[in-house]
Amino acid sequence: MSATHHKTSLPQGVRVGTVMRIRGLVPDQAGRFHVNLLCGEEQGADAALHFNPRLDTSEVVFNTKQQGKWGREERGTGIPFQRGQPFEVLLIATEEGFKAVVGDDEYLHFHHRLPPARVRLVEVGGDVQLHSLNIF
């Protein structure tokens, strides 16, 4: 299975009310995929959000990366993704954090550890077929 690697620039950053909509398909043999909200285009840039569905371990991990170091992982309850099935994720910037909505259900509200205004790039990668990435 070939890994997806897609990047979309956000030159204006992220502010309260910004919505990122990711639509795709989880392949039958998928292990993991991720959506990263990065603070720069350089290798090793800080990540304001690392959203990481792990089908191989049936969990979704949320985290940040600052100065090359990962923070404390947070996990949602259950895994709202299934191999061979399409999905829609909304990442919504709020005053408090990033709200992750999968399908019609709020999944987790990840509290800001880095200012969302620093975000410059959305990166989608791993075992996923990306259909669309829209920023509203």
Swiss-Prot record:
<dbReference type="InterPro" id="IPR013320">
    <property type="entry name" value="ConA-like_dom_sf"/>
</dbReference>
<keyword id="KW-0964">Secreted</keyword>
<keyword id="KW-0539">Nucleus</keyword>
<dbReference type="GO" id="GO:0005634">
    <property type="term" value="C:nucleus"/>
</dbReference>
<dbReference type="GO" id="GO:0001533">
    <property type="term" value="C:cornified envelope"/>
</dbReference>
<keyword id="KW-0053">Apoptosis</keyword>
<feature type="domain" description="Galectin">
    <location>
        <begin position="6"/>
        <end position="136"/>
    </location>
</feature>
<protein>
    <recommendedName>
        <fullName>Galectin-7</fullName>
    </recommendedName>
</protein>
<comment type="function">
    <text>Could be involved in cell-cell and/or cell-matrix interactions necessary for normal growth control. Pro-apoptotic protein that functions intracellularly upstream of JNK activation and cytochrome c release.</text>
</comment>
<feature type="binding site">
    <location>
        <begin position="70"/>
        <end position="76"/>
    </location>
    <ligand>
        <name>a beta-D-galactoside</name>
    </ligand>
</feature>
<keyword id="KW-0430">Lectin</keyword>
<keyword id="KW-0963">Cytoplasm</keyword>
<dbReference type="GO" id="GO:0030246">
    <property type="term" value="F:carbohydrate binding"/>
</dbReference>
<dbReference type="GO" id="GO:0005576">
    <property type="term" value="C:extracellular region"/>
</dbReference>
<dbReference type="InterPro" id="IPR044156">
    <property type="entry name" value="Galectin-like"/>
</dbReference>
<dbReference type="InterPro" id="IPR001079">
    <property type="entry name" value="Galectin_CRD"/>
</dbReference>
<dbReference type="GO" id="GO:0005737">
    <property type="term" value="C:cytoplasm"/>
</dbReference>
<dbReference type="GO" id="GO:0006915">
    <property type="term" value="P:apoptotic process"/>
</dbReference>
<dbReference type="Pfam" id="PF00337">
    <property type="entry name" value="Gal-bind_lectin"/>
</dbReference>
<comment type="subunit">
    <text>Monomer.</text>
</comment>
